[in-house]
Curated annotation (Swiss-Prot):
S-S pairs: none
Compartments it resides in: Plastid
Record keywords, A-Z: Initiation factor, Plastid, Protein biosynthesis, RNA-binding, rRNA-binding
Name of protein: Translation initiation factor IF-1, plastid
Superkingdom in the source lineage: Eukaryota
GN (gene name): infA
Record flagged with keyword Plastid: yes
């Protein structure tokens, strides 16, 4: 599948599941079952419940996706 065919969305991790799977609540209210991308796995980036993430999903199955980026938390000084 080509990169431009994927749908990018943002949401919050609500649940951590076995085998690096996560349940993410998107900004539009939908629940998505996601796994982490290879780059996140290779760089040992920790994803915990409550983190904001960017998810890409196929237009054919919007209930599954892949976490491609963990967004930075806003600092308390901002």
């Amino acid at each position: 599948m080509k990169k431009q065919d994927l749908i990018d969305m943002e949401g919050v991790v609500t649940e951590s599941l076995p085998n690096a799977m996560f349940r993410v609540c998107l900004d539009n209210g939908c629940q998505v079952l996601t796994h982490i991308s290879g780059r996140i796995r290779r760089n040992y980036i920790r994803i915990l419940p409550g983190d904001r993430v960017r998810v890409e999903s196929s237009p054919y199955d919007l209930t599954k996706g892949r976490i491609t980026y963990r967004l930075r938390a806003k600092s308390s000084t901002d």
